[in-house]
Amino acid sequence: MTPYDDSPAQAVSTAPRTTGPSLIDGFGRAVTYLRVSVTDRCDLRCVYCMAEHMTFLPKAEVLTLEELDRLASTFVGLGVRKLRLTGGEPLVRKGFIGLVARLSRHLSSGALDELTLTTNGSQLERYASDLARHGVRRINVSLDTLKPALFRALTRGGDVTRVIAGIDAAQAAGMTVKINAVALKHDNAGEIPALIQWAHGRGCDITLIETMPLGEVDQDRTDQFLSLQDVRRDLSSFWTLTDIPDSTGGPARYVHVAETGGRLGLITPLSNHFCDTCNRVRLTCTGTLHTCLGRDDASDLRAEIRRGASDAELVDAIHLAIGAKPKGHDFQIAAAQPAVARHMSTTGG
């Protein structure tokens, strides 16, 4: 097979092997979850994510598929058990399905528990069966509204019917779909109950996310901030919400909604941070390793690869970065300007 075609990958892990819980930060937290942005490009222009007339990175600055494979596989060799591919929009990256096929070897070998992705859903109808064939069992789909006009406005031109068709295709292919919705005070606040009912009616969990101060540095994020503590209080006035003791090391805290029978996740980086149990790091499409979404601390792994670093040297660079992972983020809703001046399309959503 050619390196990144769409053929089934051999069931052999080529990740550098270590023993024990390899990636432990300075606060004793094990890093077992890697999010990898495979591209900064996207076919939508969501208002809280990127500029309308976005200037994308030169291709030379973006990791090749081979480089993405090498870095992700190195992390798997160091004990990462969950790998999430993001963007931009990952499904617009040329050769993406081939990359998924290659990375699926770590599922076959048992080195990786889960290979998944976050998508805007616009290309999902086309690629759902391929993703399922290569071992993707769960996906997250970003969907902030079901209203066609509002969806077009928030995404600057998107078609919500394509996203819904993609969700249908993913479920038909056997994948579990979770909906991610950003809570926006002036746009979808009144639609949140209906969105939850719609998701649960389709057998999908849904997670609400507070706006985070990243992205366009000239934008005031306090205007759209909607506290999910307030949302939960309002929902509790007509639904029965029961906390679910589900500790995944992630930012979401889950409740069961008795009246719909579904799960609702709440990600509250501003009103109630999630740092103490953080088990994840992010690799951007340019090879920058961010050990905290809300801090500017970073390590340039692309430079290591392109200078010809050996596997052992690459492992050392990763250990050094993980050792410097901060205790918590710098997000504060009182600060009108973003705490971190970088686009989520590059960092990975």
From Swiss-Prot:
Cofactor note: Binds 2 [4Fe-4S] clusters. Binds 1 [4Fe-4S] cluster coordinated with 3 cysteines and an exchangeable S-adenosyl-L-methionine and 1 [4Fe-4S] cluster coordinated with 3 cysteines and the GTP-derived substrate.
Pathway stated in the Swiss-Prot or TrEMBL entry: Cofactor biosynthesis; molybdopterin biosynthesis
EC number: 4.1.99.22
GO function term, MF aspect, one: GTP 3',8'-cyclase activity
Domain of life, per lineage: Bacteria
Protein keywords: 4Fe-4S, GTP-binding, Iron, Iron-sulfur, Lyase, Metal-binding, Molybdenum cofactor biosynthesis, Nucleotide-binding, S-adenosyl-L-methionine
Catalytic activity: GTP + AH2 + S-adenosyl-L-methionine = (8S)-3',8-cyclo-7,8-dihydroguanosine 5'-triphosphate + 5'-deoxyadenosine + L-methionine + A + H(+)
Disulfide feature: none
Assembly and interaction partners: Monomer and homodimer.
Function, in words: Catalyzes the cyclization of GTP to (8S)-3',8-cyclo-7,8-dihydroguanosine 5'-triphosphate.
Similarity comment: Belongs to the radical SAM superfamily. MoaA family.
Protein name per its UniProtKB record: GTP 3',8-cyclase
